Amino acid sequence: MKKILKGVGFTFIAVAVLTVVSGAAFAKSLTVGVSWSNFQEERWKTDEAAMKRQLEKLGAKYISADAQADSSKQISDVENLIARGCDALIILAYDADAISPAISRAKAEGIPVVGYDRLIEDPYAFYLTFDNKEVGRMQAREVFKVKPEGNYVFIKGSPTDPNADFLHEGQLEVLKEAMDAGKIKMSVSNTPMVGSPRSLKRTWSRS
């Protein structure tokens, strides 16, 4: 991991990617390949539209692939984006560990890689994200305002997503005092095998 940038907007992401690949922020005729982990989560559809708009606004060509929550498919997707002539890659990793072969392939081709939102443990990949621990704190503060006592159910994100741990750490920081005092009890702490709305609903119903 070369760099962590937190709380960044899509304009900054687009400029950063073009700067990494070309040395000039407003480079023209560059193709940026984006590998998305899945579009089951509505957020990624929104992010894609914003990212595509900003890259094209800066003169870059946008191409993408949806891994459909499949780590093997994501590796194939990245290889396909490379074959299509991308000059830089943005990867939202479905599995931060399993994506390693794709990073190695990009490195061999001399193609810069930016890990978007989810940490890729590879020194070749830059890392762009939000302050996920602070997001967890914000979530906990708002819930605590509404329910300062009682049983809490924590449904963490996918085990393949490092951000799930950061969010949970932030939540526990805010709630620790109340938990130590016995005002809040962690009745269940579950991690769905797949971070999709359907799996989350199943986990919630079992809690």
Where are the model-predicted features located?
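A residue-level marker of the well-folded mature domains of exported/periplasmic proteins
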Residues: K2-G9, A25-S207
